[in-house]
């Protein structure tokens, strides 16, 4: 076949434009289109990312696809709705399989690329049509989002390695978690965060700490707020550095717990909830530091984005956050941010930043920007994915 023209079908799990997976797929598709890939994208809604991908020239379709996972079972309402939801999701997916098959039957699709690991529709359709399929494994699932694969994790792991299936893992640790380290059909390809040459430098910082991400348990905002509370108590003085929280609330009960903690400790005036923002890059450029407190971040798109924007990163030394710190040390011989393992260590970092001149961290910020430019540019990611497509298609055609 002519590899200069690849017809690819993409299965996406969300139309949310704020998440790292959504940002990554948008820049990836733009880059692949420039290389001759013709994308057809299926999304579960007609808003947000559906509209953005249509604007860049992708062919977009709607199908009410749902993740192939077990519903939540916490709280009386979720318990009552557990079986109805499970049946409803499976009915929607059965309908979506037929709908997507109808979309592509005359399109001569060369490869199917599912943008997350928690959906099996792409695998099923690829098997039906004899098309190679890629799982883009972006999540631990259990460790980061408390997601349980249906019918079980072992069934998914068998699917990842079955004939005609390939995988892209966004970190080495996620690849290890899913037991794909010795699988020839699996690759580690880091997300492309920003274009080469897009590093921003801003030495005129403003007086605030930043959290940017969804407000839900796995993202670790409550432990951050507890550590921040200790900072205010220990060395904040009468005018502590405020904490800005930029992000969508996706777990109202969790957010309520955070607000109750804030009120109980009398720090309402020091923490500002900004809601979802479209100017996160600017917030990063002006912050004294961004804190990445996720319990087990997959890749840590926000962390890398902050480094591109000249922002000091304070990160929980686990998962993808740890891997990025380790990559920085391996590449530069220096730390590219401030790691912590406990809330107490996070508090100490906040106190240190608050009590230091900005120039103390300028070398760390500059080193981090150099590392992410070399490892996590859009161009590097696009080239790696495109070359993997070619390898897969050559393998399937031999």
Set out the residue ranges of the language-model regions:
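Short hydrophobic beta-strand element within catalytic cores of glycosyltransferases
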Residues: 312-315, 319-322, 326
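Nucleotide-activated donor-binding/catalytic signature segment of Leloir-type glycosyltransferases, i.e.
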Residues: 255-275
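Glycosyltransferase donor-sugar binding loop
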Residues: 42-48, 193, 212, 242-256, ...
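A short, well-ordered alpha-helix in the C-terminal region of glycosyltransferases
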Residues: 360-375, 387
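Carbohydrate-associated surface elements
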Residues: 173, 192
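A conserved mid-protein helix/loop that constitutes part of the nucleotide-sugar donor-binding site
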Residues: 19-27, 207, 214-233, 253-256
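Aromatic "clamp/platform" in nucleotide-sugar-dependent glycosyltransferases that forms part
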Residues: 276, 295
């Amino acid at each position: 076949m002519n590899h200069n023209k690849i017809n690819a079908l993409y299965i996406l799990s969300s139309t949310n434009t704020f998440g790292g997976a959504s940002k990554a797929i948008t820049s990836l598709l733009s880059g692949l289109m420039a290389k001759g890939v013709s994308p057809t994208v299926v999304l579960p809604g007609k808003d947000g990312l559906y509209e953005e991908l249509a604007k860049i020239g992708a062919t977009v379709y709607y199908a009410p696809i749902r993740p192939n996972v077990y519903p939540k079972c916490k709280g009386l309402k979720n318990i009552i709705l557990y079986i109805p939801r499970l049946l409803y999701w499976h009915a929607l997916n059965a309908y979506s399989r037929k709908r997507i098959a109808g979309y592509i039957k005359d399109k001569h699709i060369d490869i199917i690329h599912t943008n997350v690991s928690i959906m099996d529709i792409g695998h099923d359709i690829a098997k039906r049509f004899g098309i190679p399929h890629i799982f883009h494994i972006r999540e631990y699932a259990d460790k980061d989002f408390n997601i349980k694969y249906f019918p079980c994790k072992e069934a998914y792991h068998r699917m990842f390695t079955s004939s005609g299936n390939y995988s892209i893992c966004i970190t080495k640790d996620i690849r290890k978690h899913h037991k794909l380290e010795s699988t020839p059909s699996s690759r580690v390809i880091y997300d492309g965060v920003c274009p080469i040459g897009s590093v921003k430098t801003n030495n005129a910082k403003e007086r605030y700490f930043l959290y940017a991400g969804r407000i839900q348990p796995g993202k670790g905002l409550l432990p951050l707020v507890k550590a921040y509370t200790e900072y205010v108590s220990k060395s904040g003085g009468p005018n502590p550095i405020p904490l800005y929280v930029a992000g969508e609330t996706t777990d109202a009960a969790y957010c309520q717990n955070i607000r109750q903690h804030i009120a109980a400790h009398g720090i309402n005036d020091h923490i500002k909830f900004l809601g979802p923002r479209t100017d996160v890059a600017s917030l990063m450029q002006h912050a004294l530091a961004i804190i990445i407190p996720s319990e087990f971040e997959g890749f840590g798109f926000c962390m890398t984005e902050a480094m591109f924007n000249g922002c000091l990163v304070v990160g929980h030394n686990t998962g993808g956050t740890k891997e990025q710190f380790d990559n920085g040390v391996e590449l530069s011989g220096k730390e590219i941010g401030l790691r912590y393992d406990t809330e107490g260590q996070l508090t100490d970092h906040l106190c240190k930043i608050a009590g230091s001149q900005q120039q103390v961290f300028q070398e760390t910020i500059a080193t981090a920007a150099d590392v992410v430019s070399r490892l996590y540019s859009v161009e590097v990611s696009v080239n790696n994915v495109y070359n993997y497509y070619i390898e897969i298609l050559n393998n399937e055609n031999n």
